[in-house]
Each structure stands twice: as C-alpha cells, then as structure tokens.
Amino acid sequence: AATIDRAVDIYAEMLARDDVTNLFGLAGAMVPTGMRAIVADLIRDGHIDALVTTGANLTHDAIEAIGGKHHHGRADPHDPHPAGDDGGGGGSGTAREHDETLRDEGVDRIYNVYLPQEHFALFESHLRDNVFPTVERRVSIQEFTSALGRANAAQNEERDVDEDSGIAAAAYENDVPIYCPAI
C-alpha cells in the first residue's frame, strides 16, 4: 500500500508540472481486453504526451473504431467461469479441440477474448481504402499513425459506430505522437 501511495504522489506531481513529458507505454493485448477507452480518455484529458504501443494494439483499436467487436468468454472449454458468468460448468473436449473448432468457425482467440477473422479483412480494407491513399510516399511512423487515427475517426463517424473512435483517433485529434516499432 505504501508503494501505491508513493506512486500516486509521483503521478500527481507529474501531472501538475508543465515541464514534464508524459510517455505512456501500452504493450500486451490491452485493447482486446478492454483498456481502449481508458487510454483514449487519458489522451483526450491531456495526461499522455506521447504513446508507445504495439502494432497489435493499433490493429485492434482500428478494428473497434470501424465497427468490429471483441467478445469475451471462456479461455478454453474447461474454464468454468466465462467472462460475466458467476458459475456454470465448462464445455467438453480439449483445449486443442476448442482452438480447432474456433479455427474452423473463422474465429481468433486471445486467451478468453474472441474476434471473428472477418474483422481482420475489414481492417485490411480500411487500410487500403482510407489510410494508404493518404500516405502515397514513404512516411514516418508518426505520420502513418496520424493518418490511421484520422481515418479511424472519419470511418467511426461515417458508419455511426457505437464504440468510441479510439486511441489512434484521440492521438490524432490531440496532436499526441504514437511510436510503434512494429510499423
């Protein structure tokens, strides 16, 4: 508890100072697991000056911005507690059989988060139709992620998507650079 108290004090001091640049690192499957809105809000509220993230997080952010959905459920057929469930029994079969069934159904799994493969095709079309035409020359990572954020925001509004336009859009709208070594 003392360590958390100290961390909160340091964070509060950091936010109060104008001479501090706040870098935010976002690694792992944070967007699929539900952290997308929190990070976008931190950007919009001025708490992040630069974002360092993975290509996977930007991919999943764009998928949700243009209407794709991540679904939370069981990690494997023997998991007795799917997300949002307070009990019940597990499924049948082995974890391998579960993954093979998902593959046959065109569904990708990130532990207990599921995403239909068709959403990746939608993302690729989004890149081809809305992002790549605006970056017809070699550009920096920041220019590319800015174009991605602009396109995500535009498509989110045009398609009237229920989900927020997301991290890349918030960064674009607030002039927050994104550094992504994978791009």
Predicted regions and their residues:
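Short, compositionally biased low-complexity segments
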Residues: F132-R138
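Metallocofactor- and cofactor-centric catalytic cores in central/energy metabolism, strongly enriched
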Residues: A1-A121, S125, P133, F144-D162, ...
